[in-house]
Swiss-Prot record:
Name of protein: Protein NEOXANTHIN-DEFICIENT 1
Sections of the chain in a coiled coil: none
Stated role: Required for neoxanthin biosynthesis. Probably not involved directly in the enzymatic conversion of violaxanthin to neoxanthin. Is necessary but not sufficient for neoxanthin synthesis.
Lineage of origin: Eukaryota, Viridiplantae, Streptophyta, Embryophyta, Tracheophyta
InterPro entries: ADC_dom_sf, NDX1-like
SUPFAM superfamilies registered for this protein in UniProt: Acetoacetate decarboxylase-like (SSF160104)
Stored PANTHER family: PROTEIN NEOXANTHIN-DEFICIENT 1 (PTHR35467:SF2), PTHR35467
Record's signal peptide: none
Organism of origin: Oryza sativa subsp. japonica
Length: 302
């Protein structure tokens, strides 16, 4: 087992060594949320300005399954706190990145300056949710004239995501993603190309402010927003240090960051896009100089 694990890590390292750009292929759900500015600020460095309107910023999540990547097959959840402004550009800021690949986690932290953590992604399929979701979809898409094209299948794929550290596990959330049927019998949406710029860094592994870009090619179509919830009752768990704690305790590091991450996920979804035939090229990050400290960007109706 140890030898096999070593070979896998060496192969993954060799895969990342062929970049940048690093190429990821698979499928994803890109979901935008209205996140309270007060929640997003918990993740944004003080020298960066949060772009907000009426007390909210634009955050959300990027939930992906990669069939081909420098680290092989793995799942990823990027929780986006909001949009930050560092002249002359604005970019997304990740609150937390969860992956079920140790090498992908290492690369995210060491090379890209992301707040990456190892997690488990447990999946089941169900006709109906057994738990009442705390986030409900809305009619925002109808305002864009997209309502008739949004998938409304009855079945969902439930994903339970738990952060792991050694042999200790802490449940983060459950995500119910709509199943949209076989690709052979559905409209995949138009083929598009776009760039998703992001800021990163300001962590122990990368104290500098970084900027990188993801060049995305995929087929995109609007879908029903995923439903996200967290069970109200958790069972106690014994961690390696012998302490008994619930899965919501402070045994793992950054309890406040995890709490605010869940708050971002439970915020109001306004748009969900399904990315199929995804090919994403991630450029190497570059160091940028933070602009002088100013108050958050604010907009008003006057």
């Amino acid at each position: 087992m140890a030898a096999g694990s070593g070979r896998e890590e060496a192969a993954a390292a060799a895969g990342y060594g062929r970049g940048p750009p690093w190429v990821f292929r698979g499928r994803a759900l890109y979901q935008l949320h209205l996140v309270k500015a007060a929640t997003a600020r918990a993740f944004v460095p003080r020298e960066l300005r949060l772009v907000e309107a009426f007390g909210y910023t634009l955050g959300g999540m990027f939930l992906a399954r990669y069939d081909d990547s420098p680290a092989g097959k793995f799942d990823e959840l990027v929780v986006i706190a909001g949009i930050v402004w560092n002249p002359p550009t604005s970019c997304a800021w990740a609150a937390r990145v969860l992956v079920n690949s140790a090498e992908a986690c290492r690369h995210g932290r060491k090379e890209v300056g992301l707040p990456s953590h190892v997690a488990t992604f447990s999946q089941t399929e169900a006709d109906a949710l057994r738990n009442k979701p705390l986030v409900k979809s809305n009619s925002f898409l109808s305002l864009l004239g997209m309502r008739s094209t949004v998938s409304n299948q009855g079945n969902d794929r439930e994903i339970e995501i738990s952060e792991t550290k050694g042999s200790c596990t802490r449940h983060l959330c459950n995500i119910s993603v709509p199943l949209t049927g076989s690709h052979k019998h559905k409209w995949m949406g138009p083929a598009i190309r776009m760039s998703l710029p992001s800021f990163s860094g300001q962590i122990e592994d990368h104290p500098d402010l970084l900027k990188y870009s993801c060049q995305v090619e995929c087929r995109v179509r609007p879908v029903r927003p995923a439903k996200i919830w967290r069970p109200r009752i958790t069972e106690p768990q014994e961690c390696p240090d012998g302490k008994i704690s619930s899965k919501g305790s402070e045994v793992l590091a950054e309890p406040d960051a995890q709490k605010h991450t869940v708050m971002v996920l439970l915020s109001k979804p306004i748009l969900a896009l399904e990315f199929n035939s995804l090919e994403m090229h991630v450029d190497a990050p570059k160091i940028v100089i933070p602009h002088s400290k100013k108050k958050e960007v604010r907009y008003s109706s006057t």
